[in-house]
Amino acid sequence: MRIELNRQPEDIPGETLSIREILKYKNYSFPNLVVRINGKLVKKTDYDTAQVWEGDVVEIIHLISGG
């Protein structure tokens, strides 16, 4: 399926995937993430149930603190 991931086109195998599956596919392991699908925030507790479909716009932002 083709989606927009962090403002870049991305081809990911499958017809639909959960956020958790996309994080695993992309090897994202940061503990503090902000995820949006088509502009809607996804709670961490919903990563297994929030589905991404063909044409969706997904943003995954890792929160990093520094000084």
Where are these regions (language model features)?
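Ubiquitin-like/PB1-type beta-grasp interaction modules and other compact soluble beta-rich domains
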Residues: M1-G66
